[in-house]
Amino acid sequence: MNNMFEPPKNYNEMLPKLHKATFLNTLIYCILLVIYEYIPLITLPTKYVPPIKDHESFINWALSFGILPCAFAIFAYLISGALDLHNNAAKLLRVRYLWDKHLIIKPLSRRAGVNRKLNKDEAHNVMSNLYYPEVRKIEDKHYIELFWNKVYYFWIFFEFSIIALISFLIIFFCKQMDIFHVEGSLLSLFFFVILSFSVSGIIFALTVKPRTESQVGKIPDDKIKEFFTKNNIN
């Protein structure tokens, strides 16, 4: 878990760190849900707990709060990786669309002298064949690492917000169907979900947005104009 706290140097390095962070955040969050009686304490007999070298004390501590926090943390880890949770959730909520449109495509279009809205194919072409290739050419490795550092922490908060929303919906459904007793306030839990998304938005506005704008600014004007002219985007 130690390398989880080290900032990634690129997107591929970020992904496994993000999955681990989501696992840990979900585990801690669900433990708090047990403590504040949002979900029941369902214990697991120790004879069913497999011995895992080097992590036995941590597992025993986690299971002291019941099987549900561990089970949901594993579930969150799996959907974080297998379903590419941060990316697909961002697409579903239009975060990626707005990010690309307002912070990358529009500024590049303006610098090329194009003031109209680009269609879907043109926008995809600009992202795939102009923005990404040019950004990869940036030689300042420290600058790139700083960018991924800011993006990494945004995705951590964003992905946790999605998990918090999913858990709220599950708890709400279970309470309505009387599957288990919920002592904690659903309104307070809902406000926590809103707070989580708000913090994600603040992190994006204060760190990711200026870093993205700075990256776009490093693409030379002549490269931008040449690309738009060559691809008949005018």
UniProtKB/Swiss-Prot annotation:
**Keywords (A to Z) from UniProt:** Cell membrane, Membrane, Transmembrane, Transmembrane helix
Q: Where is it localised?
A: Cell membrane
Regions that span the bilayer: 22-42, 59-79, 154-174, 186-206
Membrane topology term reads: Multi-pass membrane protein
Highest taxon, organism lineage: Bacteria
GO CC terms of this entry = plasma membrane
Q: What is its main location?
A: membrane
Entry keyword annotation includes Amino-acid biosynthesis: no
Q: Per the record's keyword annotation, is Cell membrane included, yes or no? A: yes
- The name of this protein is Uncharacterized protein YmfE
Q: Which organism is it from?
A: Escherichia coli (strain K12)
